[in-house]
Curated annotation (Swiss-Prot):
It comes from the Bacteria. This is Nitrogenase iron-molybdenum cofactor biosynthesis protein NifN. Keywords: Metal-binding, Nitrogen fixation. Belongs to the NifD/NifK/NifE/NifN family. Pathway: Cofactor biosynthesis; Fe-Mo cofactor biosynthesis. Coiled coil: none annotated. The gene is nifN.
Length: 443
């Protein structure tokens, strides 16, 4: 347990990521356009982060509120933005996302949208509100709010057919490669997955045939309306997807199950066993071989670690909570370590071999206490913005979280789920931790 002197009510280099979560989730719908109802800076900040990380065109618009419109109200700005998007981009869905400016002002955006919907409009499209102040919450909160907003726009609640389909509600921590791997696993059992939102079809780094002013793929309206035709809803992460899964269950009667993680041997064993139970199909042989390869990689992990290895983790609340309570303790036990201590302030696991232990400190990478503890760490697991502090402390770090990789390439192709993803993650983290191989420093 850290001493009271190290717990400081201060934050250094604070970064608000709620708008990034919404900006990443909403374009996962096909022919969809998110609009930030606020100043231009509220939109450009999140847009710069997403474009720099994924090296892709991110569709994101703004109502461009100024001093006058912020004082008198932003209904005219919303009406103009919706009309321009419909005429120029011809989108099927338009999401109005409130920002810290409009939430503080108290704009009745729902009333604005009702009045806008009653006005004559060219064609047919859907509009929805995604309320959440930018001054609160992390990217996981923005992602969850966006999913809840999507849940309120369904028009069909009945079962369309009796096909063997299931719903995959993805979390904000999943990369396009992770979602693609989950889809392949589900399809191998004869099921037809409907991913919501499907960012893998537009952030996977492909070259389109034609220019598109919005996302190049994603979950279609027809697929979203067919969520009620599925036999089960699989949600990932306890705070992001379950509210939407509960809404699907209330509207359509589709049961849901939540998996905290899909990284690790036991977690994937449970996932494949559940798919085997739901589909009635045996587990494909290739996953048995991948499981054997993962076991071989896990056997070599304790032999590479040197005495006194420490790993510091810095991430958002939900990834850290899941990582410490459900991920790293169980994963460390699978890799040959035993959990010795675990609480909200930190976690530590002691190896059966005397003389070394693995620890993880639960503090944001921007706090002074975390920096002081990380000085003794052998590796730092955090998002790409932690590279600045890691460079000053001369500590190798593995990029994990959102934003994923602002200084490198291939952020959307990083795989961490399934047997293959877990095996690759062991190798990526094991290199700097063991001190053998590339110990990459940022900068």
């Amino acid at each position: 347990m850290p001493s009271a002197s190290l717990l400081k009510a201060a934050a250094v280099n604070a970064l608000k990521m709620s708008q990034v979560g919404r900006g990443l989730c909403l374009p996962g719908m096909n022919r969809y356009m998110p609009v930030m109802h606020g100043a231009q800076g509220c939109t450009s900040f999140g847009l710069v982060l997403l474009v720099r990380d994924f090296r892709e065109a991110i569709p994101l618009q703004t109502t461009a509120m100024n001093e006058v419109s912020s004082t008198l109200g932003g209904m005219e700005n919303i009406a103009k933005a919706v009309l321009n998007i419909r005429l120029r981009a011809k989108r099927d869905l338009i999401a109005i996302c409130s920002t810290g400016l409009t939430e503080t002002k108290g704009d009745d955006v729902n009333a604005y949208l009702r009045l806008t919907a009653e006005a004559p409009r060219p064609g047919r499209y859907l509009t929805g509100l995604c309320p959440h102040a930018l001054t609160t919450g992390a990217s996981q909160d923005g992602w969850a709010k966006a999913l809840e907003a999507l849940a309120g726009r369904w028009e069909s609640r009945g079962r369309a057919d009796a096909r063997q389909a299931d719903n995959l509600l993805a979390g904000c921590h999943l990369t396009p490669a992770d979602i693609e791997e989950m889809r392949d696993i589900v399809q191998s059992f004869g099921l037809e997955p409907i991913v919501l939102p499907d960012v893998s079809s537009w952030l996977d780094g492909h070259l389109p045939d034609n220019f598109s002013p919005t996302s190049m793929g994603g979950t279609t309206l027809a697929e979203m309306r067919a969520l009620g035709a599925s036999i089960v809803c699989i949600a990932n992460r306890r705070t992001e997807a379950p509210p939407t899964a509960q809404a699907v269950q209330e509207l359509c009667g589709v049961p849901y199950v939540v998996f905290d993680r899909l990284t690790g041997l036991q977690a994937n064993d449970r996932f494949l066993a559940y798919l085997e139970y739901v589909s009635g199909q045996p587990i494909p042989a290739r996953y048995r071989r991948q499981r054997s390869q993962l076991q071989d990689a896990m056997l070599g992990w304790p032999l590479l670690l040197r005495p006194g290895v420490k790993v510091a983790i810095g991430a958002e609340p939900e990834p850290v909570a899941v990582t410490l309570r459900h991920g790293w303790p169980r994963w460390a036990a699978e890799l040959g370590g035993c959990r010795d201590h675990h609480d909200l302030a930190g976690a530590r696991w002691r190896s059966p071999q005397p003389g070394w232990w693995i620890g993880a400190n639960l503090e944001a990478p921007g706090t002074k206490g975390a920096r002081a503890r990380a000085c003794a760490g052998s590796c730092w697991l955090t998002h790409s913005h932690g590279g600045q502090a890691a460079e000053r402390l001369h500590i190798p770090f593995h990029r994990a979280g959102l934003p994923p990789c602002s200084t490198g390439l291939g952020a959307g192709h990083c795989l961490s789920v399934g047997y293959r993803g877990t095996r690759g993650l062991i190798f990526e983290i094991g290199q700097p931790v063991a001190g053998r191989g590339p110990c990459t420093y940022p900068g």
